[in-house]
Curated annotation (Swiss-Prot):
Protein name: NAD(P)H-quinone oxidoreductase subunit 4L, chloroplastic
Gene3D superfamilies (alphabetical): 1.10.287.3510
Enzyme Commission identifier(s): 7.1.1.-
A Pfam family: Oxidored_q2
Lineage: Eukaryota, Viridiplantae, Streptophyta, Embryophyta, Tracheophyta
Keyword ATP-binding: no
The keyword Protease is assigned to this record: no
PANTHER family membership: NADH-UBIQUINONE OXIDOREDUCTASE CHAIN 4L (PTHR11434:SF16), NADH-UBIQUINONE OXIDOREDUCTASE SUBUNIT ND4L (PTHR11434)
Organism the protein comes from: Jasminum nudiflorum
One function term, GO molecular function aspect: oxidoreductase activity, acting on NAD(P)H, quinone or similar compound as acceptor
Length: 101
């Protein structure tokens, strides 16, 4: 596959993630869009690592760390959303102002 095709795919996924993050009102959907953004960045890391084939540019190793951070972010984010849902009975972003209590 050509480099341009992969970069266009990654830019498309990144754009979908940004659009979903801006327009979503549900916390779980916002977390999913954030994961989509992380995955599009990982696609870029792996693509450039394979394209340049340089010993100092190791995007595939860095993408493993990004996957680990994204997994931790998803676990913590879902725990926070679960706690907010137990207390507020809603996962809507505009209804979860925790400072007004």
């Amino acid at each position: 596959m050509m480099l341009e095709h992969i970069l266009v795919l990654s830019a498309y996924l990144f754009s979908i993630g940004i659009y979903g993050l801006i327009t979503s009102r549900n916390m779980v959907r916002a977390l999913m869009c954030l994961e989509l953004i992380f995955n599009s960045v990982n696609i870029n890391f792996v693509t450039f690592s394979g394209f340049f084939d340089n010993r100092q540019l190791r995007g595939d190793i860095f993408s493993v760390f990004v996957f680990a951070i994204a997994a931790a972010e998803a676990a913590i984010g879902l725990a926070i959303v679960s706690s907010i849902y137990r207390n507020r009975k809603s996962t809507r972003i505009n209804q979860s102002n925790l400072l007004n209590k």
